[in-house]
Amino acid sequence: GYKPNRDCLEQLLSDADVIVTGYRPNSLDRFGLSPVELHNRYPGLVIGRVSAWGLSGPWAERRGFDSIVQAASGIAHIHADGTGRPGALPAQALDHSAGYLLAAGIMSALRRRHLDGHGWTVDISLARVAQELLAQPLSVPTEASPYKIQTVNARTPGGTVTCAAPAINISGGPDSYRWIGRPWGTDQPEWAEPQSASVQR
């Protein structure tokens, strides 16, 4: 079943503007999916990659995720409680920050592609995000004012799901999510057709 799956992947890539991966550097190379090989086949492709430790250094090939990087970078020590038990930033802050930075980098790469026609690769690492956060000056926490989180409900095959509403609210844009709680393996390997805001609601 490998070749039909690979042919399907290549067909999807031929129509893609952006591919986003979250694997260790070089881990996809053996499948012919390195940035160099992808750009040889699809010169205009923008590739966004998130890794734990970055592209170089002794830990580059190691697996990792937000909590591990917080521990290794010293964040867990800084946020330890009075007993010395390691702490953590709220809401997997490295993952979220890296995601926002990657999205900004991809948008910049798409703009550059529009100007020069070339594909680009954008790399973000959780370790670098941690380094940048730790380099910021310390501030005294202030008491946050109460904030009511806007939520949306959706019916799914597994029941009703309540989740945070989209972070950005654009007049006339969607105010909910197109897909919530879809069972794994039920989607066809094809790009979704764009829908108007009125249909998305």
Describe each model-derived feature in a short phrase.
Residues G1-N40:
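A structured beta-alpha segment of the ubiquitous adenosine-cofactor-binding alpha/beta core
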